[in-house]
């Protein structure tokens, strides 16, 4: 049987958004015909929110948190127990303090199985601010 591996954000769904309803129905049929795997940086809850529980459970295996939290349907088959050191968290907080970027939306250090997600901007409200943060600033 053919096997297919898909990224979620920006491939099956718009980044951090839910899958289109029409596409979702077609993709579920696809998952019934082929061994389908998902790979994402998001945790299980966010992935289910994006693709829906039917698709999530129909996939042969889902590699959440970049492979640090792996599921076969409802069954967890692997979860990394790595935790960041206090020194690393302190360093990231220092980087946040030293940044000149003026906008902060909260949730700057997000703990996930096997890793952390760090953002100067933060993971709080306001996706539009991402464009401001990633746009190159004019040089003097």
Predicted feature residues:
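Ser/Thr-glycine-rich phosphate-binding loops at phosphate-binding pockets of nucleotides
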Residues: 11-12, 39-41, 134
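Short, charged/polar, Gly/Pro-enriched secondary-structure boundary elements
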Residues: 124-128
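Asp-based phosphoryl-transfer active-site loop
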Residues: 2-16
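Active-site phosphate-binding/coordination module
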Residues: 17-108
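Conserved small/polar residues in nucleotide/adenosyl-binding loops
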Residues: 133-140
């Amino acid at each position: 049987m053919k096997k297919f591996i898909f990224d979620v954000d920006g491939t099956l769904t718009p980044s951090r958004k839910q899958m289109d309803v029409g596409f979702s129905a077609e993709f579920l049929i696809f998952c019934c015909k082929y061994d389908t795997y998902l790979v994402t940086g998001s945790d299980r809850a966010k992935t289910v929110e994006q693709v829906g529980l039917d698709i999530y459970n129909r996939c042969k295996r889902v590699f959440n948190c970049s492979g640090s939290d792996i599921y076969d349907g409802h069954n967890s088959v692997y979860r990394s127990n790595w935790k960041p050191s206090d020194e690393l968290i302190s360093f990231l907080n220092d980087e946040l303090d030293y940044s000149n970027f003026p906008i902060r939306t909260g949730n700057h250090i997000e703990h996930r199985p096997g890793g952390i997600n760090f953002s100067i901007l933060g993971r709080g409200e306001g996706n539009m601010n991402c464009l401001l943060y990633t746009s190159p600033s004019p040089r003097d």
